[in-house]
């Protein structure tokens, strides 16, 4: 199974880059080597990543595996579907007040 591994190390100059490319090319099963960012080496293929890390540590003291994943990783959806927020229906805060008979009431008042 093809997988993609990203290696990262501290000091990355032209000479170190050439040595790293040479070491990685010697591994059987390596299909793609990509050096776009400074200090990061992206290798795709079917190989033992731990042995490759050990060989790269001979070139540079600090080498770390940053990411490991399958070759054809699906692109992440940058605009996720937003769920509509449910409407909040508010009830009455207090029970309704009953009107008491007063001066202007229609009820009969006995005097």
Curated annotation (Swiss-Prot):
Stretch list, region Disordered: 68-111
Residue ranges of the propeptide: 109-111
InterPro entries, alphabetized: HIPP, HMA_dom
Domain HMA as annotated: residue spans: 1-68
Function: Probable heavy-metal-binding protein.
Cross-referenced PROSITE patterns: HMA_2 (PS50846)
Stored Gene3D superfamilies: 3.30.70.100
UniProt modified residues of type Cysteine methyl ester: 108
Lipid-anchored residues (S-farnesyl cysteine): 108
Name of the featured protein: Heavy metal-associated isoprenylated plant protein 10
Gene: HIPP10
Domain of life of the source: Eukaryota
GO molecular function: metal ion binding
Keywords linked to the UniProt accession: Lipoprotein, Metal-binding, Methylation, Prenylation
Family to which the UniProt record says this protein belongs: Belongs to the HIPP family.
